[in-house]
Amino acid sequence: MGSANRVRISSIAEVTKGVTPATPALQTERWLSESLAYNIENVQSEQIRADRTEGDLIQVGADSSGDINFELSWGTFDHYFAQAFCNAWVAGALPADPSVLENGTLKLYRTVIKEFLDMTPAVAFVYKGCVVNQISLAITKRSKITGTISLMGLEITETKPAGATYLPETTTSPLNASSNVTSILLDDVPMTSCIDTMSVQILNNFRPIDCVGKFFHSDFNYGAFSVSGNMDLYFETMEQFNMYKAGTPFKLAIHIEDDAGNQYLLELLRCKFETLTTNATGENTDVMASGSYRCSGVGGITARLTKTPA
């Protein structure tokens, strides 16, 4: 009987799409829960039968997909951020210099492996050719900063690569929305409003490419790089409502620093409020300004993530 406490998830970048490198040094992942699955697409025969029985179920394709939920910690999910941004990190000249990631057009693929270590023999599901269709972050008062990585994969096998070794998990502390969010900037000015919760979603709008003679997807093609989110703040001033009413664009920046001094700065360069409501929802409740926002590009760049080591 398998136990969740004996499940290991690991991954490695693919040089060739859908091909796991030989004797891979797999990165052991940190995670909360997962929904990685082998999805088989079936169609049913519509043949009319005189005995009134239904026709056979026919397998016409398969793929892999699912989510990995996580607690954000510095340096742990940078490979998935690169996939979500469709670009590579640009490192600074010195190890202590910041590295920068901006949205681009580079498709990055990973092999992701889920192993059930307490099964005899051990069971492994190997998800090949995985892209990150979406990554999201949730920042809520008095809570850890959590997120979800939504993967789409080309194919799956049950054979673990020969000679695989495992790099250890990172050891940086989970980040929280109380002491690790050092500032939230609106147009480079610290926000004075009290934020209850906010979220960021980065979506690549990947779609599968299917071909005659292929049981699995041949590839994925990306659509628009879409950045959006939600923000609930205590209704204290008309500032955000006036921005919503006038369709005023704003730059949103979130600065996060762990207890060791490692930093992330997420910049969304041009956003507008898409919705915003100010409702009294019941007796003895606070009135919240609850809005959603959507971002567009400035010179082709919609989002920028900067990481700086301590």
Label each residue range with its predicted role.
Residues 1-310:
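Signature of extracytoplasmic/envelope-associated structural regions
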